[in-house]
Curated annotation (Swiss-Prot):
The gene is FES1. Signal peptide: none annotated. A zinc finger (C3H1-type) spans 96-123. Transcriptional activator involved in the FRIGIDA-mediated vernalization pathway, but not in the autonomous flowering pathway. Acts cooperatively with FRI (FRIGIDA) or FRL1 (FRIGIDA-LIKE 1) to promote FLC (FLOWERING LOCUS C) expression. Required for the stabilization of the FRI-C complex. This is Protein FRIGIDA-ESSENTIAL 1. The keyword DNA-binding applies. It is found in: Nucleus. GO terms for biological process: cell differentiation; flower development; positive regulation of vernalization response. The zinc-finger motif is essential for transcription activation. Keywords: Developmental protein, Differentiation, DNA-binding, Flowering, Metal-binding, Nucleus, Zinc, Zinc-finger. Residues 470-479 have a biased composition (Basic and acidic residues). The keyword DNA-binding applies.
Amino acid sequence: MSDSDMDIDDDEVEQKVQVHTIVRESELFDKPPIQASNSHNDVKRHSVTTPLDEQSKIIKEQAFAQDNGTLPRFPAPGIPPRSFFTGGGGNEPEQKRAALPCKFFAKGWCFNGVSCKFLHVKENSNCTSQQLAENSMAGNGGIRSDLERRILDSREGVRVSQLSENGVTSLPTREDISFMNPQRVFSSMSFVNPPGSQRVFPFNNEMRFMPSFENIRRESLKQTYGADFTDNRSLVINNANSFALRSSFVHEHRPSISSYLKTDMGSAGPAWTGSLSSSVPMNDRASTVGDFENGNSLSGSGSLPTLQGVAVSSDKGAEANTTSTKKKVSSDDWEPSEPFKASFTIPPYILPSSDALYDPFTDIENLGDRPLNDSLSSKGEHARKSSCQQKDGDSASGPQARDCKNDDKSSSCSQNQHQETVARSLEAHGVVEGVATSVVDQNDTATPSKEISSATAAENRVVLKRIKPAGHDSWHRSDGSSYKKTKKSDEIDGEVRSDAGMKVMRLFRTAVVETIKEMLKPLWREGRLTKDVHNMIVKKAAEKVVGAAVQFHQVPTDTESVDQYLGLSGTRIVKLVEGYVEKYGKP
């Protein structure tokens, strides 16, 4: 072909492009402008800096693709989106290098948002996998041209922007799905515009699906969740809410959806091939189930699932698995995925048991059940019996001894009874040992009954005086000793306070009496008062002054305060003394 023919073809292509751009402008004026997403902003920003020769090549490719019916309408006429894919070889010189990822966004410091010139890639996503996928797609031997990749990129960006504007924030973005298989992505997106159907492209935040896809979607949902699900929920409609499920369905069918995902993912193996959701991690799949519709998840047979992660395959085995997992859904079937466990648990060996609790009554010794007391009492009885037998053997020598034996038996029996009562009374106070030893010593002595009884009583008193405080303290070891000590300390403090108060009162009373006597001295010298009247006036006046001071809590405590008190109340004391003198003195 000659150069003139090439020029003529270029002119014809430019005329066709102008005609198509005029038609697209007239159609776009009837529609409101689309709020482009991050990818479209990047497209417009980078397309401005594209050289003129590259723009002319891109316009030619668009015109060729439009004639074949494979190019959708773009929101901005004449400005094609820039491809972010890197070139696979030297045969594509018009491709530009991929945009660099934003380092500040990965650290959470980027404040530019949509206007940032770099790609916003999450930390956990593989940044190099996108470039590898793009290189593999670019090196497919010329099967898919650069224009097709640009179309795929623009469609993905527009759909992501629409889902983000409709309130769905958990949809995977361009960066999130960069690690997917490019062959699977292209196969799922290549039949968006099938022959014999209307063109699918979003306008004004709406997504228009084909009727065949709508029927397939309803049938798959009826087989999976029942007929009432598709009747009560408008899943495929031409409005802005086509990607959002109702909250009531989310609350009612969330358990069945999660169980369906777990069973189908574990058993249906090959049924997940050919969909975007098969390459999404399990945690992302489980977190977004029931929250939005995934329009990009298309299976190889052409069925369109509505929930992300629920992919209906054309395999018969997959259909059997999906139908076998159906069950009746109710709002009361909620169960936690894991049993409740407290974040902090106390080990059982730290908690005090009922046996380990303190019992104050265990400190009180039950002296009646002590084996020591039993042994001591048995020793005392054995000693008394042996002493009686020894006395009987010694007194068998003569008749006088027999008479004494009878007397001694009666006296010893009475003595033993008395000592047993004393020992029982003393056992309660912890003096069994001392009493037993004293009883043994007393039984060994051959004294008359009166002397024995008097000596026993005296010795018992000594034993009680010597041993009772220790026994009493041991008896009340838990609470009695402390109470007794505090009582003694209180008594001591009270006595000290009373002694100090008595000294203060004595000092104050003496000062008052001396003051009254000084007032009565002139009258005493004149002879107007007798001795008895003088003493009576001094006594009554002193009691009156001291009683008033005690009543109003004005008793001075030292000599200076006493002098000050008497100086301030001197006039009242003088009037009081004059009154008594006029009453009891001589005229």
